[in-house]
Regions:
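Short, charged, surface-exposed secondary-structure boundary motifs
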Residues: 89-96
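Alpha-helix-loop-beta-strand connector modules within alpha/beta enzyme cores
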Residues: 68-86
Length: 104
């Protein structure tokens, strides 16, 4: 049996059906999905928890506390939710890089 995790990131030009991959070893299966908005994130969560038995979800720092609560509700009480947040300096560096890439 493998530990199954889903990583979701907000990306302005993402299409969740197109932008994803699966990485896998004998003991670990990581699903990666890029989503444009919260509605796509919720759909991905519901679909993969049901179809793949996801046990843990990792979210990019762009998810708000409200978003995280909605994702927890969609995933169910038996799925762990983690948000990948950096310290102040790291967040600033990432924001500048995203700005240069044209995210906003």
């Amino acid at each position: 049996m493998k530990f199954k995790t889903l990583f979701i990131a907000h990306v302005p030009d993402a299409e969740s059906e197109r932008d994803g991959c699966v990485l896998e070893t004998g003991k670990y299966k990581l699903f990666v999905r890029l989503v444009k908005n919260q509605d796509e994130a919720l759909k991905v969560v519901k679909d993969l928890v049901e179809s793949e038995g996801i046990e843990s979800i990792i979210l990019c720092p762009g998810f708000t506390h409200k978003d995280v609560a909605e994702i927890q509700d969609a995933a169910g009480e038996n799925v762990g939710i983690t948000v990948a947040r950096g310290d102040s300096k790291s967040s600033k560096i990432a924001m500048e890089a995203m700005k240069k890439a044209g995210w906003w």
